[in-house]
Amino acid sequence: MPWYLWTPFVFAALLIAVPPIVRGLIRYRLDDYRVQVNEVDARLPRQLETKRRVAVLGGGVAGLTAAITLARRGFEVELFESNSYLGGKLGSWKVQLAPGEDAWVSHGFHAFFANYFNLDRFLNSLGLRTGFQSIGEYVILGTDGAQVRFGKLDTTPVFNLIALARAGVYRFRDVLKAPARDLFGVFLEYDAKDTFERYDNVSFADFDRLAQLPPRLKLAFNTFARAFFSDEDKLSLAELIKSFHFYYLSQDGGLVYDFPTHDYEPAFLAPMRAELAKHHARVHLSTAVTSLAKTESGFIVNGAVFDRVVLSTDIVGARSIMTKAEGVPDEVKAHFDALTPGQRYAVLRIWIDKDVREGFPPFVITDRVKVLDAFTTYHRFEAEAQEWTKRHGGAVLELHCYAVPEDLSPEQVKQALLDEFVQFFPEAKGFTVAHEVFQLNRNFTAFHLGMNAKRPETDSGVPGLVCAGDWVKLPFPAMLLEAACASGYVAANTLLRDERLQEEPVDSVPLRGLMAGMPQPPARKVLAPKGRA
């Protein structure tokens, strides 16, 4: 009998009979859930002795990580940011609600998961991993009012899958018979090379259709998929496999995460600006990069001469800068020209005169009707929002759509967010909006079909120019904020290595899944456009 037929039953028997032993074997197989991906030679010096000027293009998490790391090591750093604030997707800026009444707003709520190893280390190096609160529960709210809760589930890989069944997300008979039995194994088999070769040209919608997902499991998959700014028919199955490996099947931190209880500006960005100033780095806000040229000895950025460049803008900025850059080979430009952003995403912050019922964590994912993917109740945890509700009553909410349908106008998106919110919270019907801030952007990294092969790596192909951002192909699995921070460290390490300096340690979840390398079931061929299995 092939392994994929008997393995589920053997695993189930072992899990029931000797769970401590099985947990230990899983931890061993998954490298104790954490690996260091680079070697740090402690014999090498840490500080730069010769003058090196570095231009960091983009002040998001990736650029800030690289800039602060290099500035601390003695590089002369200049950071260029087109916005009037630092932070990128973690950025924050003030808006006026009324005369004498301002508020900080941002691109939206961010989660800080237990396996964000590099981001944690970066924040800890600044003394900023304080003032966080646990979300307590990870909730998906269905249109029928039913809730799928993940917070109390077992966190050990494989045990957490069984826990989903016990929580009613699926029934064992749904996944132990074909076709699901033969297809679900892909999520335990992550391997960067094989996974992307086999499944990068397969959409999650194709997988859903072939696997015949039960309704609640489909809901969990769909909401998770849209968090990567893509509808199911556009999202690469390989990228989804990587994200499931990263968040759920490679470590025992679970899906319960932390979040800061203060706005990102005082919590993160002001201290980061102070750290840059402490190490004599120059920051140019509201300064777009209008020209980049490679020269024999280095680079010219906006007319100024530099020895090295870190390209750390968002995906739209990176494509614009590199396709117009002088002295850059055409084959390098082609990689950047292939970059495209994901679908539009919308964030609507509203200050309203009615509150909503309690009993939910501050951030809740929703079963989308047409646009509403999640909402945040800021007045339940953020000091500034709490002060506003003390003065005015009501609530401060944020409504999210991660993948906006292409056929909707901005006004239609905004109205649909409000309408769908009331469907979930009818007690808010008839509310009045005192203030609102609506954002509709298209600048997030796309994880669409077939994009991985041409995705730029840290080494841009131009000597002295390195890339950082969540759009960069890394040699280890990472997603979202962790991918941005880790890529900043990898970019900085490349320049440190060039100068024979000690690198910064970079950690990752295990590089391969629990069942990676196992033979593929013949039925798996239905997922492979080229017949690979």
Model feature map: region roles:
Residues 49-79:
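N-terminal Rossmann-like FAD-binding beta1-loop-alpha1 element of flavoenzymes
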Residues 119-120, 124-125, 129-241, 504:
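Mobile amphipathic helical/loop "lid" adjacent to a hydrophobic cofactor/ligand pocket
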Residues 12-23, 27-34, 287-397, 402-408, ...:
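Mid-domain catalytic core of redox enzymes
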Residues 243-299, 306-308, 312:
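Helical element adjacent to the flavin cofactor pocket in flavoenzyme catalytic cores
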Residues 385-391, 441-475:
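FAD-binding beta-loop-beta segment adjacent to the flavin cofactor pocket
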Residues 2-54, 72-73, 511, 515-533:
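Extreme N-terminal leader/targeting segments of oxidoreductases
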Residues 98-134:
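Conserved FAD-binding subdomain of flavin-dependent enzymes
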Residues 71-96:
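Glycine-rich FAD pyrophosphate-binding loop
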